[in-house]
Amino acid sequence: VLGLILIVVIVLLAVFGPGMNSYTYSGQDLSQKNFAPRVPGLEQFGILDGSEKMSTTTGTKVTNAYQEKDKLDVYYWFGSDLYGRDIWTRTWEGARVSLIIAVAAAVIDMVIGMSYGLISGYFGGRVDMIMQRFLEVANGIPRLVIVTLLLLVLQPGMVTIIFALMLTEWVGMSRIARAEMLKLKDQEFVLA
């Protein structure tokens, strides 16, 4: 239950997170670089108020870049990076891309793997033997090599990553589907 709640929260933040503030994914302001996290409402409690402890040769020093640069109306919920880009927006934009790749690869993997495994298990005999030998060869090629070669040959991007995952990750699903088909095909309710 906790895992499902966490996944739902991540999906909701990936969808709505970048729109929760005024910053864009690629927008940058070099005058606001390396700001610590600052969240409206929590700053009154001394939590996420934009201050940070810095170690110096004489000890530690508490600084607040928002006050030093007179940016009291600026809020970076996760802080800003060395180019002055909002980390909150960039985090959830990245999560959005990762979720799209994961869902697409899982769906394609399930369709190819289940189809291959069910066909192999259903027909059995020579068809099953040939399909399983091909599966063993495909499983013997290291996945990292295939992914790296595809990224070198094709233009790097989301489609290439989905294609690489699709080519390499269907083997496990195929074996599971084949085993289930072989188990079910000999059951009495099927033979009747």
Q: Model-predicted segments: where are they?
A:
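Gly/Trp-centered helix-boundary motif
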Residues: V1-M110, M114, L118
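Alpha-helical transmembrane segments of integral membrane proteins
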Residues: L2, S80-A192
